[in-house]
A protein has these predicted regions:
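Conserved protein kinase catalytic domain
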Residues: 11, 70, 97-98, 119, ...
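Conserved NTPase motor "head" modules and their coupling/switch loops across ABC/AAA+ ATPases, GTPases
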Residues: 16, 28-32, 135-270, 277-293
Length: 294
């Protein structure tokens, strides 16, 4: 199952590697000729395999960058785990945004990785400071300043993409919810930001002493959230289980519609046992919408 937390868990028990291969052909606009077919092959080796780890090829050749594979096969995955988007932690809602953006925009994954790398380095420095492993004060402040410059640059770019994407996704999701609920409640989607555009650098400077005392980073795009509201109330607090499912279904169908608008082609919808988690009305809504996209 793809639900495993580690690549090695994708490999069948008793084997040393697993292979996933697909031949894809893309047409970005209905009036355009389709692209040439591409054979994409991904291999995952266990630690004791002749070649451990994950590696990929496109038409027999490795991609120039691993990030280059992102978006090569546009797909929207919907599995039971997504049903926790409403009541789950903010991390899951950020992951929902970032996974979609990695497919839609070349370079987003590289930007995100640069942010994460700088954040890890900063947290390591802050932990050592709080734990008594002291660097000279001037050296510590200089290192933090360098890392904060990188975090501000990458964080601003990430937040900008997230805001732009939600500006498209939100109205689509709200329209879906209105159709599903027959107008019983009004859904709203907001980006809960820690800073206004252009303000991350100042925020990092403002909270630097607080972060030194806490031993961890306290601000940035890794602390932001997506607010899901029903009739202006937080869905994670007040929504029933049925309403939560409607919110998630509305978001996932909006994700597919947003991808089609941005790229000019409909993504593949991958449903993993999610129909068993939906009641008859929501199941029929999903199947009807899927038929419309064929």
């Amino acid at each position: 199952s793809f639900r495993g937390g580690k690549d090695a868990e994708l490999v069948r028990r008793g084997e040393t590697f697993a292979v996933l291969e697909a031949v894809t052909q893309r047409t970005r606009q209905e009036d355009q000729e389709p692209d040439d077919p591409a054979r994409v092959r991904i291999t995952v080796g266990t630690p004791d395999a002749q070649r451990p780890g994950r590696y990929a090829s496109v038409n027999g050749a490795p991609p120039k960058r691993a990030a280059g594979l992102a978006g090569s096969f546009p797909a929207v995955v919907f599995d039971p785990g997504h049903l926790s988007l409403v009541k789950g932690a903010p991390e899951g809602r950020r992951r929902f945004l970032d996974a979609a953006l990695c497919q839609l925009y070349p370079g987003y994954l590289a930007t995100y990785r640069r942010y994460v790398r700088a954040l890890q380095q900063k947290n390591a420095l802050l932990r050592h400071s709080a734990g008594g492993t002291e660097r000279p004060w001037a050296e510590k402040c200089a290192l933090l300043e360098v890392l904060n410059v990188e975090l501000a640059a990458q964080g601003e770019a990430i937040q900008k993409r997230r805001r732009e994407y939600l500006a498209l996704l939100g109205p689509l999701a709200c329209a879906n919810y209105a159709e599903l609920s027959h107008g019983a409640e009004r859904m709203a989607v907001h980006y809960a930001a820690q800073f206004e555009p252009g303000g991350l650098s100042a925020l990092l400077k403002q909270r630097q002493n607080e972060e030194l005392r806490a031993g961890q980073s306290l601000c940035g795009i890794h602390r932001e959230d997506v607010e899901l509201l029903l009739d202006d109330q937080p869905a994670k607090v007040f929504a029933s289980q049925g309403q939560q499912r409607s919110v998630v279904l509305s978001l996932k169908m909006a994700e597919a519609a947003a991808a089609a608008r941005i790229t000019g082609e409909h993504p593949v919808l991958l449903l993993d046992d999610v129909l068993s988690e939906l009641d008859e009305g929501r199941k029929q809504y999903l199947l009807t919408r899927m038929k419309e996209k064929q």
